[in-house]
């Protein structure tokens, strides 16, 4: 992943949720765990919370987190930008 500033990150879609939690220093992943369904990756999580397939450039708001689908490869989300609202 890349950290652009204190609130903005770029992740690969295949990033494991547990690695995502560590990267953003999330102490309690309960909020994400309650909504992740069967997903284990960031891309899978976005599919779960949108209940569909987001388009490139689509913005998905989840509590104080804003995800933007930045890229696809072979119909898979491969890049996600995250902004954490303070």
Task: Say what each PLM segment does.
Residues 1-86:
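Cytosolic regulatory modules rich in charged/polar residues
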């Amino acid at each position: 992943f890349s950290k652009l500033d204190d609130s903005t990150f770029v992740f690969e879609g295949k990033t494991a949720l547990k690695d995502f939690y560590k990267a953003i220093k999330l102490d309690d992943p309960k909020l994400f765990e309650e909504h992740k369904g069967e997903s284990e990756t960031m891309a899978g999580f976005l599919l779960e919370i949108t209940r569909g397939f987001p388009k490139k450039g689509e913005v998905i708001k989840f509590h104080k987190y804003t995800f933007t689908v930045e890229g696809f490869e072979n119909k898979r989300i491969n890049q996600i930008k995250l902004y954490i609202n303070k």
